[in-house]
Structure formats: C-alpha cells, structure tokens
Amino acid sequence: FGKGSTTKAAAMAQMIHSGDPTQWPADGPNDNGKYLPIPMYGEVKVSKLAYAVSIPDINMKRMLARIDIANSVSNFTVEEVYLVNYNNAGYLSPVWDANGVVDIASGDLNIPVANDKKVGIDPANYHLVAGNTPYVGNIYTFEASAAVDDAGGNDGAASRKDAVCLIVGGRRTGETSTTYYRVDFTQTGKTGEDVEYLPSLRNHKYIISITEVSGPGYDDKQKALESYTVMSNLKMRLITYDRDKIKDVVYDGQYMLGV
C-alpha cells in the first residue's frame, strides 16, 4: 500500500484470507491442539487518536460461518462428517462501497472472485465425530453463495451438485457398516422445486439437527455426494441465525428460543 496513493477501497480489496490448511483448526478433537483465531472486522470513526479521546465500542464481525451438528435420533450414531464444495478464501470485511465505507450490519455476501473453491470428496474437510453429538464449534467455513436450482439438470458450478454441503457418515442400531447421507443447506419445510437453498453467511451459525433416519444411506461418499436429486433417508432441521443479533439459543428438537 502507498501512503496517500492507495484508497481505502483498494486496500479493502486486498484483505483476503485464504485457508491454510484448508480445514480451519479450532482446537477440536481432530486438530491435534492447533487453533487459528478467526479473523474479525470492525471499524469506528474518531475525531483523532489521543489520550483524552474516548473510543466507543467497536462491533466486530467474524468472517467465517460456523456449522454445528445435533442428533436427536436414539438409534443413529454420527461417526464422521465431511464439509464438501466449500470456498477456501474470503474477504476479511463485509461489503463496502466505492469509497471504502463498510456496512458492518449488511447481510450481503462478500466473496472474492478468486475464492479457491474446493469441489468434490478428495479435498473435503474431514471431522471424526465418533458419536460425540452435539458436535459444536469445530466446523468453520468461508462465505459461499446459495445453490441455484435450475430444475433442468444443469450441473454447473453454481448448481445444486456443487453446492456447499455435508456428507454425514453413520450407523443405525444393528448396522455393521457406515453409510453416507448428503445434507444440503436448505430452507426447512419446502420440497421439490420449491426448495430454497441458503448461502453460507459470515458470522452466522448453522445448526444441522438430525430428526429422523428412516433407512441406510449410500455405501460410498461419492455416491452420497451425487444424490442431490434423490430424497434422503436422513431428515434434518436447519437452524440458522446471525450471532450478532442472537446470542443464546435453546432448541428442544422442535422449537427454538433465541435471546
């Protein structure tokens, strides 16, 4: 950056964080004690920087989305989870205008063109759950756009096939092998062509609450990934909220109370 020559907007455009490693280390059971602080952004205007100048509170916003797994099905054990088709880079800041003025309260996506999207099973983030649900505070990801339901079999990069999703591996009571289910980030209560896909928004929490498992999944993770057009034997409820607006949430499997 050049003093007096680099505009704020130009500087903001260079503030991109890339995932390295691709799985965000959150000091979870799979991170071997590693932890990478989550970048946050906030700003406030002051008349000048001086000892006597009081600086007001600064509202900070996390640049990542968090995904938690809950399971209320007594005869089903979640063994492992894969985060698939995720972006591996993101802007540090929420959206800004041509003058570099940031709208910290904006709910709009702010995704760099060079987002290093990781598509498919091979680069997927692996999480060993081993029945320890709820599985919380371990899965983080950069912002990503909602899938586009073309309803025409178009499997381009923005379609349902390559949308951010989870592959959940588990067993029902009595089963001797792990099977896999695809879980998409969709609006609860709608089916077929009316399904609404949700984006992954910064500073938001997404709780995947498994409510029913009526049959086995696929014996292969790739088959599960390709099952985006097939009704799943795993039913879930997706709860999502902005962590700035709702601090504490209680969920009993049917109703949610947020404060």
Give the location of each predicted region:
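Extracellular beta-sheet/turn segments enriched in Thr/Pro/Gly and aliphatic residues
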Residues: A10-R62, A70-S72, T191-G258
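Tryptophan-paired
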Residues: F1-T6, D57, R66-H204, S209-E212, ...
